[in-house]
Amino acid sequence: MQSLQVKILDERMRDQLPSYGTPGSAGLDLRACIDEAIEIVPGQTVLVPTGLAIYVEDPRYAAFILPRSGLGHKHGIVLGNLVGLIDSDYQGQLMVSTWNRGSNPFKLEPMERLAQLVVMPIQQVELKVVEEFTESSRGAGGFGSTGRT
């Protein structure tokens, strides 16, 4: 298993390190490192600290902060930036942009699992300017061009 460097910025997190919920989980659960409950009203976005910093280091990898499906489906709590991209050379605190897109206020409790962190391989590319593309079967068709079934 690949290792990931983590720095504990808030001592309360020492016993609350991100973990996988099940053996098959892809994401490590991130918690809200807050002193007291926060009420997030509909339409509001709040930046929530995790009390942790990571250093991926290897430029062949990046980390992604993703929403937890249950919070989004049941309560309308998603990420304000939809996906948080953590570059391999970033070393600051992980923050979760938390948006209540639902219709009811949501009470976020201290140390509540809020988002998940997924580490994935990344391929950097070199851009090659061309005048025309080699023709493909799809061409420039997009936004529903392949149908629904």
From Swiss-Prot:
GO terms for molecular function: dUTP diphosphatase activity; magnesium ion binding. Its cofactor is Mg(2+). This enzyme is involved in nucleotide metabolism: it produces dUMP, the immediate precursor of thymidine nucleotides and it decreases the intracellular concentration of dUTP so that uracil cannot be incorporated into DNA. One of its GO terms (biological process) is dUMP biosynthetic process. This is Deoxyuridine 5'-triphosphate nucleotidohydrolase. HAMAP family: dUTPase_bact. Substrate binds at residues 68-70, 81, 85-87, 95. InterPro entries: dUTPase, dUTPase-like, dUTPase-like_sf, dUTPase_trimeric. It comes from Polynucleobacter asymbioticus (strain DSM 18221 / CIP 109841 / QLW-P1DMWA-1). Disulfide bonds: none annotated. The gene is dut. Belongs to the dUTPase family. It catalyses: dUTP + H2O = dUMP + diphosphate + H(+). Pfam families: dUTPase. Pathway: Pyrimidine metabolism; dUMP biosynthesis; dUMP from dCTP (dUTP route): step 2/2. Keywords: Hydrolase, Magnesium, Metal-binding, Nucleotide metabolism. It comes from the Bacteria.
